[in-house]
Amino acid sequence: MKGGDVMYLEIGAPEAEPVTLEEAKRHLRLVDTIITEIEPEEPGGEPTIITSHPDDDYIKNLIRTAREWGEAFQGRSWITRTVTAYLNEWPSCPLKLPMGPVQEVVSISYFTLEGVEVEVDPSTYWLSPDGVLYGKGWPFAPLRERLGVKIVYKAGYGDASAVPMRCKQAMLLMIGHWYENREEVIIGASSSGAAQIPAAAEMLLYQEREIPI
């Protein structure tokens, strides 16, 4: 392990999912069967008709789980969110920030032996287009024993429209797999008849998979 390796990550939740509930239901070929009529707020107005499916909440959970699975498999962030990385010491070489693509560094700070957080001057570091952090020279102040360096940055492709289609398709494959197979599954060939993780979903995500060095 090199000096200044990322030791802990806090990954914020995205504001939306790459795949909508309606897109997932179309992939599953589900038709809404519940019709809800909401009375108008103004007298004489038209009622609002809302349709839904009994499994809507379950499918929403599958959407979130499929996105989390895909991001973990690739080691990347798909929808913009805030990521906070903690290091035990300053990087001894340029640092590849995890869970990219990295859009911008929001702040870098460190914690003194007394636990006081001090922000670093932004002019002393910069970010390359491939998400590598460079520093002109890090502060010499002694750090607290653990997680003394804190890096906050924005990561992700953007909103849902910016997420690559292969990522969305991998999500849909996993959503369909989990919807049809709600019990334990296995990876690889088996004669027991147990369901398998769809290899196509992984193949779609291999292209930009981050492999830690």
Predicted regions and their residues:
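Divalent metal-cofactor coordination and adjacent catalytic microenvironments
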Residues: M1-I213
